[in-house]
Structure formats: structure tokens, C-alpha cells
């Protein structure tokens, strides 16, 4: 393998069942379009993308056309990909297990404003407050980052 390598040891279990795979290469600063759609675009950043994928599948089963984009990088943002999202849908939901203030969702809102995006954007992430101790699932529920809360936020956007 040529180039830098990162080994990550997250808390808890991973989501990849078959992990003995060749290493994947990611183009620096490029997002990955996991699913195309036009009613709503869900932009996820980080491991919360697994929950986002489940929500997308659930909404697709209900007949909604939902795109899912894995941003991969918070910086630099893939502005070309985001401009394509702005052109293809009027509803965007950003999801990250990071701070709302100054996070990926904020950067997307800033770009949307610069691009005169007229659609609706809802950001989900960690509030700028003390989060009580608890299990990761309890903390996600508290912050509205559990799968059901993400689904409800997406559904509200779709029906507005």
C-alpha cells in the first residue's frame, strides 16, 4: 500500500461483517454517492451513516425517492457533489455525531447560502450543551441521533 494509512479503534462494535477485505482507497475530499434519489438527500458524516442507510431503506420501502451521500470528509467538503445535490432536491437532511455548531452541517448550510439554495436543510448532530452520561445508545436518543429520531426528522422534511 502506498500513502498514509489510518487505523481506527472506535468504542463499541463495528458495522462491517466481512472485514477481511482489501483496503479501500478514498479520493481526498470526495464524497461517495451511496444511493440516488430526488425527494430528499440524506448527507451523513462518520459512523452514523449506518443508521442513515437503514433510514434510507425504510423510506425507499415506503415509496420515497431518497438519496444517501456519505460525505467521508468534513474538510474539505466535496463542493461539486453538494452543488449537484442542491440542483437535484429541495430537501436535505445532514447527520453527524459531531457538534452542530461549526460541524459538517454548518459548513453545508454556509455553502448552500453562498449558492442561493432555496430548499430546506435540517441538520442533526450534537447540541452545544452537556450531554448526560449513559450508554452510546442512550446518548444518541438524548441527542435525537437514534434511528427512529433520524427517521422521524426525515419523514417531517418529506411531508412539509
Question: For each predicted feature, which ranges?
Answer:
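Thiamine diphosphate
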Residues: 1-160
Amino acid at each position: 500500500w502506498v500513502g498514509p494509512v489510518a487505523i481506527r479503534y472506535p468504542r463499541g462494535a463495528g458495522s462491517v461483517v466481512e472485514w477481511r477485505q482489501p483496503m479501500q482507497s478514498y479520493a481526498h475530499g470526495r464524497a461517495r454517492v451511496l444511493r440516488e434519489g430526488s425527494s430528499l438527500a440524506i448527507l451523513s458524516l462518520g459512523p452514523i451513516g449506518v443508521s442513515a442507510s437503514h433510514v434510507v431503506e425504510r423510506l425507499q420501502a415506503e415509496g420515497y425517492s431518497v438519496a444517501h451521500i456519505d460525505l467521508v470528509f468534513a474538510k474539505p467538503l466535496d463542493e461539486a457533489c453538494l452543488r449537484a445535490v442542491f440542483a437535484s432536491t429541495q430537501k436535505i437532511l445532514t447527520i453527524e455525531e459531531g457538534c452542530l455548531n461549526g460541524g459538517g452541517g454548518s459548513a453545508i448550510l454556509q455553502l448552500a447560502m453562498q449558492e442561493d439554495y432555496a430548499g430546506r436543510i435540517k441538520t442533526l448532530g450534537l447540541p452545544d450543551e452537556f450531554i448526560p452520561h449513559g450508554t452510546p445508545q442512550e446518548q444518541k436518543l438524548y441527542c435525537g441521533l437514534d434511528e427512529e429520531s433520524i427517521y422521524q426528522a426525515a419523514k417531517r422534511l418529506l411531508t412539509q
